[in-house]
Design a protein with these regions (language model features):
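Catalytic machinery of carbohydrate-active enzymes
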Residues: 1-313
């Protein structure tokens, strides 16, 4: 019998990789043994109790593993079989995306993600109490304007609330090449840690924060392994397909703030049909599928400020 290996070579995103951990955990209990992993992000699995051997895709080829392992490919976006049954990520819960590719689903109580950080390393001048923000750029539909992040920070500071910013510049290759630079700006009361933290330091900062503010992002899913207050800013993908599960539910210490537009166009199959004449098609998700001049699904600064005050008072 070949040893089981969770094959994530097609899974490129940080958040998508974190969302494989519920499937990994279920495989552990099914096989009754630790599961090896092939991944672009080995640091995600470094301290995971369910993992046997971690293979880095930059160092190990799939072909070299085929003889000794059963390769369980869990993340195969839109790859169809003879019955044209592919998976469409914008229409699916991102945790189920991994599980469904292997032929099963996860129950709500099984959907929590796993990440075990290294020990906390103190950060110089870190405030005792702070709101943590994640001001980075992604697809336009998932980017809150940089000026809004600055204004939110200023409003919090003016009310005596320290702010710490985290995030890393990156890029993503999918249907488009998307550059994801950070919004890097000084903070009067607090600390700018953009492009400075490890994944473990980031986890601890989220855990220690009064609240963590982010769009739909990789760090949203990392936050799902903490006990922090999470504020997710609205975007065009239905929040129920992305919001973290903790204690078997999605509303535990979780707050979704949307704007006036609540149709979640990126998760509506009608737009795929409109673009491709088939529900199998994925419309261009980077923009507004209603062709509005601005993203009305995004919240205002005052909405976010008021929610933070409500949480931390």
């Amino acid at each position: 019998m070949k040893e089981p290996l969770l094959d994530l070579h097609l899974c490129k995103g940080l958040g998508d990789t974190i969302c494989s951990t519920p499937t990994l955990r279920k495989l552990f209990f099914a096989y009754g043994k630790k599961i090896s992993v092939l991944t672009d992000h080995p640091y995600i699995f470094k301290n995971n109790q369910y993992v046997d051997i971690i293979f880095d895709t930059s160092e190990t080829s799939r072909e070299s593993l085929e003889e000794g392992y059963e390769l369980l490919v869990s993340f195969a976006p839109n790859i169809e079989n003879q019955y044209k049954l592919g998976l469409i990520h914008n229409l699916m819960d991102i945790r189920q995306f991994h599980a469904s590719g292997l032929g099963f689903n996860l129950l709500p109580e099984e959907c929590g993600v796993d990440f075990t950080p290294d020990e906390w390393e103190p950060i110089q001048n870190l405030p005792d109490k702070f709101v943590l923000i994640h001001p980075v750029q992604s697809w336009a539909s998932r980017t809150w304007d940089g000026e809004k992040w600055k204004l939110l920070t200023r409003m919090l500071n003016d009310n005596g609330i320290a702010v710490v910013s985290i995030g890393k510049s990156s890029s993503e290759i999918g249907f488009h090449m998307v550059q994801k630079p950070v919004f890097d700006f000084p903070i009067k009361l607090g600390l700018n840690l953009m492009n400075q933290t490890t994944i473990s330091q980031t986890w601890w900062l989220i855990q220690k924060s009064l609240s963590f503010v982010t769009m739909d992002s990789g760090l949203l899913h990392l936050a799902g392994s903490t006990d922090s207050q999470i504020i997710q800013l609205g975007s065009s993908i239905n929040w129920r397909l992305r919001a973290p599960f903790r204690n078997g539910v999605q509303d535990y210490k979780y707050h979704y703030i949307d704007g006036d537009c609540k149709i979640a166009c990126a998760s509506d199959m009608r737009y795929g049909v409109r673009e491709w004449n088939s529900i199998r098609g994925i419309p261009p998700l980077v923009g507004c599928l209603e062709n509005k001049k601005e993203f009305l699904c995004h919240p205002s600064v005052s909405q976010v400020f008021n929610k933070i005050n409500e949480i931390i008072k």
